[in-house]
Amino acid sequence: MTRIMKAYTFRMYPTLSQKELLEKSFGISRYIYNYFLGKNNYKKCINKFQCIKELPELIKENEWMKEVDSCLLRTSIFNLEDSFKRYSKGLSNHPKFKSKQKSKKSYRTNNITSTYKGKIYNSIEINLEKKLIKLPKLKEIKIRGYRNLKQIKGRVVNATIYKEANKYYVSVCVEEELTIPVITPTKAIGLDVGIKEILTTSDGITLENKKHIQKYENKIKGLNKWLARSTPGSKNRYKIIKKLQTVYKKLKNARKFYLHTISNEIIKENDIITCEKLKITEMTHKSPISKQIYDASWYELIKQLEYKSKWKGKIFYQVDTYYPSSQLCHHCGYQEKNLKDLGIRNWKCKNCSNQNERDINASINILWEGIKMYLKNELQAD
């Protein structure tokens, strides 16, 4: 049995009083983050324990903080600490103050278990039959999502409540025990990602890039134009922002659905999956095709393949970033170094005269590398 962390996202339907409390919670979470960032703005890291020690005094000075879940005060500090850690590792810029208008409205609360008169109580409870979730301070809220899910098997760890496109959502993190099947690999596949075709497989199959951004691009441009002309603080501006957020939400959902469809099919049909290890940040830096790369969502696709492989007992490998998969002839291994121009889609091997299609050739080379990795691991295990 293997323990995994799984997230279930539901849409919430709070009452007016619950909405007020949610908005207060978002505001206080942002206030705590900004308060301790202001005190540590010129530092490279923060001491979260020292910040937590200062909380009781801060609550005394601001009585309105008692109205919300006390857990979100600490998690806001933990989020700030994570931001500083990412900054110190060079993964992001220095943490910035959160804006009331621009920053994402969200907070996280942990599930706290307590015992009273022999009964066990959890601060976060989900009833899928009645379609209700119980959250600290908010009591029960109606939820919707996962039509076929009858019961969540596992321990609820925490819940992240957020607002997106004027709708409220809760993402529940659950620790589950998963029985991973032991399989004997019978089929392997190599995958090459691209812009025109999001995936080319070593079997010669190409999966088209839906280019979701093209469907919504004109609408986004039009709404942004109206937004620029609207008066700050006006009702009309608020309506435009709401419409814009809805369009972005649709775009995000369309991308994710398509990627889940692709990854599910690949995992179902294959036992060894190999793809490239990509450095997306480097590829998009000052690149004329950066928008197309972001729209293709390669990182999300690879991430899905990785965790789904683990859950299903499949084997997932990534070849080195600088492995010349497009330059090597899969037939004889000859390397043609003059193939840096992406416009060259077909080339003839000078060594064996084999005609190679760029993407299919690359995916076959990636497949061979994956098989080599598998055999190497098997020999080391013996």
List each language-model region with its residue ranges.
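Gly/serine-rich nucleotide phosphate-binding loop at the start of the catalytic core
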Residues: 1-73
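Hydrophobic residues positioned within well-ordered beta-strands of beta-sheet architectures
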Residues: 8-10, 159, 170, 189
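Non-catalytic, well-ordered alpha-helical scaffold segments
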Residues: 20-23, 27-30, 34, 71-78, ...
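Stable alpha-helical structural segments in soluble proteins, enriched in small hydrophobic residues
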Residues: 36, 72, 76-87, 360-370, ...
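Long, hydrophobic, amphipathic alpha-helical segments used as structural scaffolds
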Residues: 37-44, 84, 88-95, 176
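Acidic carboxylate diad motif detector
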Residues: 53-164
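Positively charged, helix-rich recognition surfaces that bind polyanionic ligands
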Residues: 150, 164-382
